[in-house]
């Protein structure tokens, strides 16, 4: 459902931010 989509989007966002920080 929508809550699952939010959880998935949040995890993707966290992974993206973490990757950006690691690449700096």
Swiss-Prot record:
One of its GO terms (cellular component) is extracellular region. Keywords: Amphibian defense peptide, Antibiotic, Antimicrobial, Secreted. The keyword Isomerase does not apply. The keyword Secreted applies. Transmembrane segments: none annotated. GO terms for biological process: defense response to Gram-negative bacterium. It comes from the Eukaryota. Expressed by the skin glands. It is found in: Secreted. Antimicrobial peptide that shows higher potency against Gram-negative bacteria than against Gram-positive bacteria. Has a very week hemolytic activity. Belongs to the ascaphin family. This is Ascaphin-4. It comes from Ascaphus truei (Coastal tailed frog).
């Amino acid at each position: 459902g929508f809550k699952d989509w939010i959880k998935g989007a949040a995890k993707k966002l966290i992974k993206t931010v973490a990757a950006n920080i690691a690449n700096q």
